Amino acid sequence: GLGGLMYKAINKELIDQHNQSQKSNLDFDFEYLEQKLKKSNIDIHAIKEQIKKFQVAVPTWGVGTGGTRFARFPSIGEPQNIFDKIEDCAVINDLIGFTQKVSPHFPWDNVEDFKELKEFANSYGIGFDVVNSNTFQDPSDGSASFKYGSLTNSSQEARDKAIEVNTQSIDNGKILGSKGLTVWVGDGGNFPGQMSFSKSLERYIDSMKKIYAHLPKDWTVLLEHKPYEPAFYSTVISDWGTSYICAKELGDQAMCLVDLGHHLPNTNIEMVVSRLIDVNKLGGFHFNDSKFGDDDLDAGSINPYEL
């Protein structure tokens, strides 16, 4: 851990030895596939080069133990802090080789010294991708309540605090070498008449403009939509259309993020992606899978063809 010898849950040499023992079988299968694809005029080496460029950032919360609205069950050896999470993410990269960056979440992953965190991660060969902000839980210092919304709250005081969480996340990310911020808000209502549809969206755009103004010139802000949860009657940023309207209003540095679980059942997500590409607003993905909603299952485990 921090300040001591580098810790690896699985030794890289062990992984290499195991891979070496399987190499002859892999080479045989690869050569067979190469000849098979050749008959269709497909160059396997060109595909291999494309795949080598593909990188996925592991979300730091992905190596922790999640929970449901009923309970949370801790697991053996679960990370206690961001340094523990980096160690686990490094093992994932050792195993699969294309997760050289992580995506942290603030304030969950806050530390006193972000320069120290960056150096620690780099010692494991890990860098930092897009950072994420959390305004769906109240600030730990009790300075504001997000019970009735964050960036869209009718209280200016609450909105200002939510904006501050985001600008602070940008500042943290700058030290870590990140180039982007993802904003997902749980703002919404559970009853008809609880909130104004139009005024809440106006407040969201107004708040986002202040966050957007804080972005470095080479950064991107990714707007993430979700149809429901935690609110069920209405969610302010509920679909890709709303996300697109807001991104267009903010400017060229604002893009839309597509989480594969943030859609109503039977939504054609592939077409949503195509539409956003057509209007130059597709900014990124959160890869997962679902049967009903935001199930957060392994990518491709339910809908492999869709993926």
Tell me the role of every PLM-derived stretch.
Residues 1-174:
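N-terminal pre-domain/capping segments
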Residues 34-50, 127, 133, 144-251, ...:
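Active-site acidic/histidine proton-transfer and metal-coordination neighborhood
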Residues 61-63, 105-109, 133-136, 186-188, ...:
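Active-site beta-loop-alpha junctions enriched in small/polar residues
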Residues 73-80, 195, 233-241, 263-307:
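Gly/Pro-rich active-site loop or hairpin
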Residues 75-91, 112-115, 166, 198-208, ...:
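Well-ordered, non-membrane alpha-helical segments in soluble/globular domains
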Residues 117-125, 249-250, 273-279:
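Short, surface-exposed basic-aromatic patches at helix termini and helix-loop junctions that form
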